[in-house]
């Protein structure tokens, strides 16, 4: 194979590439597989060390890029993941979903830039076997919750099945509309040393990963557009379209215009992004239990002042948590009465409750017999041999070989890797198996192939597997062409399918072409048309959008005030004997008032002025990047990101690109640099990037979001927060009379912080007075930064809410604030009392500030009220209204 000219120029050709890859594979430099699944089949090169034809173009592309190019590729993929907000929360698989550690934060999704390439011939084998397996599991599910002939005929042992947590007694008698009971199926597979494929696990409870698979395709296709165009892998998007049609078709027969929702456990779910991204692709609302209610045997979604009927639920909540009435009583993730609604046939839940029984590891032992009995077919895809402890001969084999098997409990889900257990652990396990043999199975250790990975700019070898997906259609099962590939963890952890990174799976087309038209497979049209995507206005969603508006505005205002304070500090830190320098402690005190955290006391005296200027650098640092500092900039950004994650399906992709840049700018940093110049550079960058990001986000919201009730509630949050911030800032800076030079400096800084200095100078020709400032910042309805403007927008937004009467309590409260404001006059507000205070100004600002807080509280207690027992996703402490 001759290297390309560009590869030769780069000094990195295919021969060198292969030599490095062979060395890495032989020495196992990336993953130590000597105690793990072994090298086995190599996807990339054949037994003679030559690149397989399926991978030729990729080998050329990697060789052409060289080490520097591979490094850049990793960086590009990381940036794309960051920009798209693709996350994953790594949690203990046995974590209680009800009492999980909410301190766990989602981390960035790890994706290997190099795809796993599958030939057209291999895909034909996989597709046929996968579809057959879905058909078989569907037949088993229908039998187990129907006639149970496989039990009565002795093919399946009841003691193994009914003790499995996936069996749901309350699901007996539930029948999905149509011919299929298993709606969606995911299957983990690997390749054996002889090149054939083997199934390692089936996922039927609430299969995850299809959203990640399609997100991975988007990222990798953008990262290597030239290679994507050259290889022209078959697209994954038809699967999303097929899934959408299938969900609509799954509605009860009486539903003429079906409404479909995706039920999620919430943002703390391990695969929250997967759920939200899939909901976005499908065009269906992402909901949580708080959004739904069962009334009169029907499922409804809470909307502002009304209820909307729901016909189909794509369930991503495990079955036992789906209904606290009929299933797990302490669940906060389910909907009371959902099981009863299913029994009545008023709603379809997919995958159906009870489908998790198909994940029983003991079932693998009987699949060959079941395939012959139910399908009259031999399995096309096999699993590693399984031995069930309930059969004497197999129990003997299991006990004799426990140190070399994968041991699984059919009751607890516990999985033990025999080769990793000590003698004492093996002896204890043998006793447990002898005591209750029917609940244990032993499986031969799975084997995996290896494939190229991009590790630190070097082409390395690692064990790989893949998860493939199907969805039920009236005509059969439709697979995703491709799926979710993954790089296995080093050593024995691979046997339990522990992964360290994902891989996009590229299926080569049957006939090479530079482009392939993306179309939905030819399917029978759905029986129902399906409702269009309607605005989601449940209290939970509206609450999160309300707080998005508040946190976004809070971050913008905080960034601007921090910039002004930092700049004034550098101007006056060597001029502390001037009257103008008093603006620094005043601004510092304003920061303290706004954040509810005192920066100092007694600002204004010469001693205090010097003292506050001295501590300004450390205070500005903590107020910018310290996540534990109340009211800090990073805390506002984190609150914004958390609220956005909860309503991901409501937001555009551009939102995540902006948020990613802002989060990086203010991410947690260590102690400030010793050098003041270095610290200032860090702060300047963080504050400026946050301000730019918030302005961009405001533009995205204004120009890209539909101005529905959700947008209205977000704007309400924005207007309340801007009003709170403005009244707190003006009260902290203008209510006390100071030396004229100091007052001018303070007014200038305040106007800059309010983004109104340019218009002020143009109107007043540079003359500074408190009356002129209040005229502009309180009474000018044409100034989008003024208080009256916020009140007018707030009043209009409240009027636009569904069910508005024009005289609701929040509307009356805003009218009262407007009346009070319009009765005041700038000249009167400038008047000074005997104690040197502008008492009327201070009283007005304090009163409106308190009233705005009251409006927020009333909205939270009424339109945004969550059902009884529910808690805000970030807890009460962080949801307090600020400024104080």
From Swiss-Prot:
GO cellular component terms, alphabetically, are: plasma membrane
Q: Which domain of life is it from?
A: Bacteria
Q: Which PANTHER family match?
A: BLR2978 PROTEIN, BLR5612 PROTEIN
Protein name per UniProt: Uncharacterized protein Rv2567
């Amino acid at each position: 194979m001759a290297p390309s000219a560009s590869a030769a120029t780069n000094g990195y050709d295919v021969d060198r590439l292969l030599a490095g890859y062979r060395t890495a594979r032989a020495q196992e430099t990336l993953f130590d597989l000597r105690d793990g699944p072994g090298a086995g089949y190599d996807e990339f090169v054949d037994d003679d060390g030559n690149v397989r034809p399926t991978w030729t173009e990729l080998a050329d592309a990697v060789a052409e890029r060289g080490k520097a190019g591979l490094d850049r590729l990793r960086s590009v993929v990381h940036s794309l993941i960051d920009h798209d907000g693709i996350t994953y929360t790594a949690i203990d698989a046995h974590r209680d979903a009800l009492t999980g550690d909410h301190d766990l934060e989602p981390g960035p999704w790890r994706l290997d830039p190099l795809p796993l390439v599958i030939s057209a011939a291999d895909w034909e084998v996989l597709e046929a076997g996968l579809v057959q397996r879905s058909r078989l599991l569907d037949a088993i599910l229908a039998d187990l919750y129907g006639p149970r002939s496989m039990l009565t005929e002795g093919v399946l042992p009841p003691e193994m099945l009914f003790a499995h947590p996936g069996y749901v007694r309350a699901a007996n008698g539930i029948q999905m509309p149509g011919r299929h009971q298993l709606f969606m199926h995911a299957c983990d597979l690997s390749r054996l040393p002889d090149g054939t494929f083997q199934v390692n696990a089936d996922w039927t409870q609430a299969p995850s990963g299809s959203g990640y698979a399609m997100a991975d395709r988007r990222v990798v296709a953008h990262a290597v557009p030239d290679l994507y165009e050259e290889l022209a892998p078959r697209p994954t998007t038809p699967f999303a379209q097929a899934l959408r049609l299938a969900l609509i078709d799954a509605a009860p027969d009486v539903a003429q215009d079906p409404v479909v929702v995706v039920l999620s456990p919430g943002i703390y779910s391990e695969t929250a992004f997967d759920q939200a991204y899939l909901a976005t692709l499908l065009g269906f609302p992402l909901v949580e239990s708080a959004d739904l209610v069962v009334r009169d045997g029907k499922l409804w979604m809470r909307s502002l002042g009304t209820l909307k009927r729901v016909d189909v639920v794509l369930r991503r909540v495990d079955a036992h948590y789906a209904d606290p009435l009929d299933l797990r009583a302490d669940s906060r993730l389910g909907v009371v009465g959902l099981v009863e609604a299913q029994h009545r046939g008023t709603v379809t839940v997919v995958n159906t409750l009870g489908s998790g029984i198909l994940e029983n590891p003991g079932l693998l032992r009987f699949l060959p017999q079941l395939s012959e009995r139910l399908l009259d077919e031999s399995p096309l895809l096999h699993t590693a041999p399984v031995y069930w402890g309930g059969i004497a001969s197999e129990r003997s084999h299991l006990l004799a070989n426990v140190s070399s098997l994968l041991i699984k409990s059919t009751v607890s889900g516990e999985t033990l890797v025999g080769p990793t257990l000590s003698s004492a652990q093996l002896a204890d396990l043998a006793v447990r198996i002898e005591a209750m043999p029917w609940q244990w199975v032993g499986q031969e250790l799975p084997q995996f192939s290896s494939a190229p990975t991009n590790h630190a700019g070097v082409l390395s070898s690692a064990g790989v597997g893949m998860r493939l997906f199907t969805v039920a259609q009236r005509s059969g099962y439709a697979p995703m062409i491709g799926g979710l590939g993954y790089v296995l963890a080093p050593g024995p952890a691979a046997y339990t399918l522990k992964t360290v990174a994902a891989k996009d799976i590229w299926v080569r087309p049957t006939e090479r072409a530079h482009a392939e038209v993306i179309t939905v497979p030819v399917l029978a049209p759905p029986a129902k048309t399906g409702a269009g995507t309607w605005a989601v206005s449940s209290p939970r969603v509206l609450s999160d959008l309300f707080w998005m508006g508040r946190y976004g505005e809070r971050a913008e205002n905080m960034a601007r005030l921090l910039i002004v304070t930092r700049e004034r500090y550098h101007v006056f830190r060597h001029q502390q004997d001037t009257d103008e320098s008093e603006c620094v402690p005043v601004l510092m005190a304003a920061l303290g008032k706004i954040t509810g955290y005192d920066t100092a006391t007694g600002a204004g005296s010469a001693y205090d002025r010097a003292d506050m200027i001295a501590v300004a650098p450390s205070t500005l640092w903590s107020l910018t990047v310290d996540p534990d500092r109340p009211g800090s900039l990073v805390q506002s950004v984190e609150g914004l990101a958390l609220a956005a994650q909860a309503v991901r399906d409501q937001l555009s992709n551009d939102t995540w690109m902006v948020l990613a840049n802002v989060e990086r700018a203010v991410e947690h940093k260590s102690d400030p640099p010793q050098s003041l110049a270095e610290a200032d550079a860090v702060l300047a960058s963080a504050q400026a990037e946050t301000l730019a990001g918030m302005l961009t986000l405001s533009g995205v919201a204004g120009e890209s979001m539909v101005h529905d009730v959700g947008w209205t509630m977000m704007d309400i949050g924005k207007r309340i927060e801007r009003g709170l911030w403005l009244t707190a800032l003006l009260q902290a800076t203008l209510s006390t009379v100071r030396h004229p030079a100091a007052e001018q400096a303070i007014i200038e800084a305040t106007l800059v912080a309010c983004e109104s200095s340019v218009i002020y100078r143009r109107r007043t020709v540079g003359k500074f007075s408190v009356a002129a400032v209040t005229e502009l910042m309180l009474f000018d309805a044409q100034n989008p930064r003024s208080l009256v403007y916020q009140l007018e927008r707030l009043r209009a937004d409240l009027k636009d809410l569904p069910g508005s009467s024009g005289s609701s309590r929040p509307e009356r409260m805003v009218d009262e604030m407007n009346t009070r404001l319009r009765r005041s006059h700038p000249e009167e507000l400038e008047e000074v009392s005997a104690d040197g205070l502008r008492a009327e100004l201070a009283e007005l600002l304090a009163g409106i500030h308190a009233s705005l807080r009251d409006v927020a509280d009333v909205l939270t207690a009424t339109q945004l009220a969550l059902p009884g027992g529910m808690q805000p996703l970030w807890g009460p402490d962080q949801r307090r209204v600020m400024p104080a």
